[in-house]
Amino acid sequence: MTDLPGLRVRAAAAFSLNVRLQLTFAVLLMAVAGFACAEHMEEVVVHGEPLSPFQAQAGMAPLAETNTALLLKRVAGANVNFNGSLAGMAQYRGLYGARVNTAVDGMDIGNACSNNMDAPLHYLPRTRVDELSVIRGIAPISSGLETLGGTVIANSTAPIFGTADGFTVSGHTAAAGQSVDGGYSLSGDAALADRRHRLFVAASYEDGSNRDFGAGTIRPSRYERSAVDLGYARQLTTGVLSIDYRRNDTSDAGTPALPMDDISSDADLLRAGYSAVWGVTGLDATVYWNDIEHLMSNYRMRPARSGMRRDNAAQADTLGWRVSVTRPLLGGALRVGTDGHAYDYDADVADPDNAMFFMQTFHNVKRDRYGLYAEWVHDDLGPWQLMSGVRWTHVSSDAGEVNASMAMMMPALAMLRDRFNASDRSRADDQFDFAAVAAYALSDSVSLELGVARKNRSPTYQERYLWAPIEASGGLSDGNVYIGDVELDEETAWQFELGLDWRTGRFDFAPRVFYHRIDDYIQGIPATDPAVIMVGVMNGDPTPLQFANVDAELWGADAEWSFAFTDAWQARGVVSWVRGKRRDIDDDLFRIAPLNTLVDLSYRAERWSVTLETEVYARQSKVSLTNGETRSPGYALLNLYAEYMFPRYGLQLMGGIENLLDKTYRPHLNGINRVAASDVAVGARLPGDGINIFVQAGWSF
């Protein structure tokens, strides 16, 4: 286990459009204003950050890869549920979707698609990624509001303050292209900075056609996305004040594993910050606001049956904050804090051929979370290092009354509507979490780690407020239609972990074994209500599923390792295995990654390097009968990368070939194809990319 590095204390404020939180924001804004007249000081580092010892970094794959989430395959225990070129959900140790807390530039982005086309990492284009890491094992309770499935941290590139009184200009530009979809990306950023000010602007653009695989083309899988970032920071006597804005526009992004495609996802992301240190006390606060408008369609990028053309317009607004104070206590560091996340959502379905048709899929949905926590870290107790924390989180949710034009002609649908509207939709949960991790150094190179935690998660709006059986399942992509349950209970997980860190400098090996016991796990089960079944039949699924509380358990092991043969020759790899089962019946959990490993062998000279990489996935035969999941065969891939640098000119060139042998393979975590006009059969799992030749160039100044 490595030493605990420094904690950078940050803070934030933002404009509030939510009346319920105006008082909170006013207090934070006044705190920022109170320091606005302060003078310059160096950025302060306070030791005691509890996250870094347990982080596992994702290797940086080529810029040509547009789906940022796919980088997670390079982390032990992590993977990605793939539904489209820009649609990827983080999976960690068999848990995914809302169970995995994902922080993008410190924000918990409330996405606008009920099928997670725009999962959080969608809003950090690959060209802007500076860091993508997973807090390995049990996530500290300070890392987020609901961290039952772990925490993923993604940060974009950002400039630093200058070292002189005069302003200097710096920046980076890059261009990349790849053959698998004829795609290309362009990006650039520039900064103007001195000791006290830091002004930043960045832009990126990505465009690609349908993706090829060994036996044809996946349709539709084309995409287009652009992003613009603006940022400003000011160093003050007691800290740093910053404000950042991102505009992300996605258009015509195919998602063949889902019933509709992403026609547009237009997002405004605003984050403001302030950091301060007084003596040994540090303040860290972040306030952010996200507004996302999203349009889905089942006919604009794929053929639709006559009379069944549909558009779905959705909007999501998020207001969030994190405030914490850190100071020494009993030889360690104590952090106390509060965080919150207020989320509003609406989604309406329309028929472009019939102005009278409408369906309020989700209406006036609110899901608000507020938390208080305390966490203590000590990294110098002789051979011991300790982290422990407790958290209280309040989750409240509600939804407005719904309606649908088809209810006038479908008594079963009218019954479901009336039952939902008459129900008590206002719900509240109080969660109590704790986490404790201890590491013991057996020697200078070997340490043991033991962790235990209790984590909770409340139902998502889909699981609770989906009032009619349709395929708005949070991106499960199993071909089933789902209906929610207002009466769902929260999930409660007991988590246990045992690990070893063996680090000699030349050889590093860090295995972990884990066990999760989850009570009231939320899973679709066969619906028994005749009205639900009748509407399901009319929607093309005679066996609809209803979200329900069941009992589950997951266990497994993962490891990361590296070995330096010489200063130039190095090998590294990760291996992951997880098993997920229902405890209430004899069935397996859905969409669990099979045993897999990634190994690369690299030769690194002063200015150039070459890497041969292999990915190996075992067959997955432990599948969910409830979800109708099919087994998948194993496969192995070879990738080749090369890089050359011209330090004198700030130039970097990179190229490579992925899937060198052009194998046809179907990753188990890929979704099920829904599109007839494709070389992939309807109901078959989406194949992985065929051979992909890519090149990229970058220039730093």
Features from the language model and the residues they span:
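C-terminal beta-signal and adjacent terminal beta-strands/loops
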Residues: 457, 519, 618-622, 644-701
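Extracytoplasmic beta-strand/coil segments of soluble accessory domains associated
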Residues: 69-108, 136
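Flexible loop and strand-edge segments within Gram-negative outer membrane beta-barrel domains
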Residues: 208, 214-215, 219-225, 239-283, ...
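Outer-membrane beta-barrel translocator/receptor signature
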Residues: 127-136, 141-214, 221-227, 238-239
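Gram-negative outer-membrane beta-barrel transporters
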Residues: 330, 379-386, 394-395, 509-510, ...
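Short acidic/polar hinge/loop motifs at secondary-structure boundaries
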Residues: 108-138
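Structural signature of Gram-negative outer-membrane beta-barrels, strongest in the C-terminal barrel
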Residues: 234-238, 244, 288, 331-335, ...
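Outer membrane beta-barrel strand-and-loop segments of large Gram-negative receptors
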Residues: 229, 314-325, 361, 365, ...
